[in-house]
Regions:
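Short, Lys/Arg-enriched N-terminal segments with co-localized hydrophobic residues
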Residues: 1-11
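Conserved catalytic cores of soluble enzyme domains
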Residues: 14-15, 155-277
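Terminal amphipathic helices with adjacent charged low-complexity linkers/tails
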Residues: 257-314
Length: 338
């Protein structure tokens, strides 16, 4: 049996998709809403932007000026040196002023690689540690190990937060344990900035590599305690500066200043794999393994064949490395030790 279309008689013209109860004067877009209620909408937008920028203010303008007066960058300025991309900051809503409780943690994108980062904000409580931000730091360190990405630590801490009592030690305890768990799993590059004592000196040395610029200090205690306990006058540089630490092997690399230390960390990172399951980055080369290099042949001949005492002649191995590796590109660790 044939059933006719329900609207074949032309009744469709009596129907409409428009809502007869709609109020046409209501704003239909975000822009229209902003114009319709400008005060409340703009107030919320401005407040949102203010909250996003609040963490970067740290402990306030006056403390940032003090940091600059000492010739030091803030933690946010150091992050900007490491990457031009906007960092993905994690756990930053800790603290009454969204200051991250004195520690900034996040994920950076450095030349296409994800890198976990933490950095003490010295403008907030002198970057000191308590149980709260210690748990936050441990969480960030373990996250790097779980995701198989390198870790960069920017240490600028006065040590445990004294008013917290033993809570400061609890914070370091969690961070120490986390560092041991990722050891050998992902590479960690630690940088020393400012004046670090106590736990602030213990923690970074547990990393894979340690870089210290000039005009910085880290040690279990400072010169004043040495003077009181031993009656010996000693400067911070003599006790815990980059020169003494480089010669003893505590520090792997030294730098002229903070900027040099950060750039050294970036170059070191370019030689390292993301984790122990992946190969290190490599660059294509047009050189052949069996290729003859005239400069290399001359160097070997002058050192061994033409020397009066043959293999007993002392030589600078760095000259050989420059000839053996592609384009003379290699990265020396602990150059001042021994």
């Amino acid at each position: 049996k044939h059933f006719p279309h329900p609207f074949s008689d032309g009744t469709m013209k009596n129907y409409s998709l428009e809502n007869p109860f709609a109020e046409n004067d209501l704003p239909s877009t975000v822009k229209d809403q902003e114009q319709a209620v400008p005060s409340r909408y703009q107030e919320m937008v401005d407040r949102g932007r203010e909250l996003l920028e609040l963490p970067k203010k740290g402990g306030g303008e006056s403390r940032v000026q003090v940091q600059h007066g000492k010739g030091r960058m803030t933690v946010w300025e150091r992050i900007r040196v490491l990457t031009e991309n906007d960092p993905h900051i994690t756990f930053q809503n800790w603290g009454a002023q969204l200051d991250g409780a004195g520690i900034v943690t996040g994920i950076l994108n450095i030349k296409g690689r994800d890198v976990a980062l933490y950095g003490h904000d010295f403008t907030v409580r002198a970057g000191s540690m308590d149980a709260t931000n210690g748990a936050k730091l441990a969480r960030q360190i373990l996250m790097a190990g779980d995701h198989g990405i390198p870790l960069i630590g920017m240490n600028d801490s006065a040590g445990a937060f004294v008013p917290a009592g033993v809570g400061g030690l609890d914070g370091y305890s969690e961070a120490f344990q986390a560092m041991r768990k990722i050891s050998g799993v992902v590479p960690s590059i630690m940088l020393m900035f400012g004046y670090n004592a106590g736990g602030g000196a213990y923690l970074p040395r547990q990393g894979s590599f340690l870089i210290q610029p000039n005009e910085t200090f880290f040690g279990l205690t400072g010169p004043d305690v040495v003077r009181e306990a031993l009656g010996e006058d000693i400067t911070p540089d003599e006790l815990g500066g980059p020169k003494v630490h480089s010669q003893s092997g505590v520090v792997d690399l030294s730098a002229e200043d903070e900027l040099g230390a950060l750039r050294t960390a970036l170059r070191l990172l370019s030689y390292l794999p993301d984790n122990n399951r992946e190969l290190a980055p490599f660059a294509e080369t047009s050189l052949e393994l069996e290729g003859y290099v005239e400069e290399e042949a001359i160097l070997l001949r002058k050192t061994f064949a033409d020397s009066p005492s043959g293999f007993n002649t002392p030589l600078d191995m760095r000259l050989f490395l420059q000839q053996l590796v592609d384009y003379g590109d290699y990265f020396e660790l602990q150059p001042e030790r021994g």
